[in-house]
Each structure stands twice: as structure tokens, then as C-alpha cells.
Amino acid sequence: MRIAIVGGQNHNQETYGKLLGKTGRVEIHFYDGIPKKHNKRNLEKLIKDVDLVIVILGACSHASMWDTKKAAKKCHKEVLFSRGIGISSIVKQIAGKPAYTA
């Protein structure tokens, strides 16, 4: 399974990758959630090649969150939203347990 995580600090990316990638079944791709010049295009490029998108709400700009939602809709990908920024919240999202309920 290939997962895109949008939002979060760069130093967490290595930790997420190590813990989630241990099984060999999960490939993690990151986007820090900071709006950039070609934000929409970069997100579309990332999202088209993954199976699932997780947005870390507390570590992502509003602009990137909306751009992510639009790109995921265009690419027909599922988006999950996590209020927690820790690895346990991300693992729960992947396992299908509600880390965030609207």
C-alpha cells in the first residue's frame, strides 16, 4: 500500500517511515503541507501514485488541505483526516480505526 501523508514536520518523516514501513507492505510519501508556488500541481503528482491520503490537520495549512482534497477528488483517491500529529494517530488511520470523527 502506498500512502501520502500531507502535513507534519520534516523530523517526523523519518520516524513515520521507519515505523510504518517495517512491514514492507507500506510505502510512505510525504508533503509538508506548506503552500508552495506550484502546490496544486505538486499535490496532484503525489496523490495520483498513492492508494490513500492522510492529512494531518494540525500540521497543514488550510490552502494545502483544500488543494489536497481537490487533487484527491480529481484522482479518485480516499482522504482521511487526522487531528493527531503522532505516529499512533497515523497508524490508527491506516488500520481503519477512527483517529478523527467529524
Swiss-Prot record:
InterPro entries registered for this protein in UniProt: UCP020408 (IPR016772)
Highest taxon of source: Bacteria
Pfam families: DUF2325 (PF10087)
Entry similarity comment: Belongs to the UPF0751 family.
Protein name from the UniProt record: UPF0751 protein Dhaf_1351
